């Protein structure tokens, strides 16, 4: 499985997931109406949001977290 780790104006950076990590995730943490912190990568289980300003989406196909 190949997941996106960074998505910038210069293009995307990907990572081949290690054995046992068969999901990609994208985590959006809303700081304010102008700024959102985004984290992407591989995971074994889909993480749960830690607060109401955070959303997490998991998927299992190549680059699905772009």
Curated annotation (Swiss-Prot):
GO terms for molecular function: toxin activity. InterPro entries: Snake_3FTx, Snake_toxin-like_sf, Snake_toxin_con_site, Toxin_cobra-type. It is found in: Secreted. The keyword Secreted applies. Its main location: secreted. Non-competitive antagonist of alpha-2 adrenergic receptors (ADRA2) in smooth muscles, and partial antagonist of D3 dopamine receptors (DRD3) (inhibits 25% of methylspiperone binding to this receptor). Also shows a low antagonism on D2 dopamine receptors (DRD2) (short isoform). Shows high affinity to adrenergic receptors (Ki=14 nM (ADRA2A), Ki=73 nM (ADRA2B), and Ki=38 nM (ADRA2C)). Increases heart rate and blood catecholamine concentrations. Belongs to the three-finger toxin family. Short-chain subfamily. Aminergic toxin sub-subfamily. This is Rho-elapitoxin-Da1b.
């Amino acid at each position: 499985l190949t997941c996106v780790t960074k998505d910038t104006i210069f293009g995307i950076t990907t990572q081949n997931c290690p054995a046992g990590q068969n999901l990609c995730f994208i985590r959006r943490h809303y700081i304010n109406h102008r700024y959102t912190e985004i984290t992407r990568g591989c995971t074994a289980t889909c993480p749960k949001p830690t607060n109401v300003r955070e959303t997490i989406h998991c998927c299992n196909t190549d680059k699905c977290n772009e």
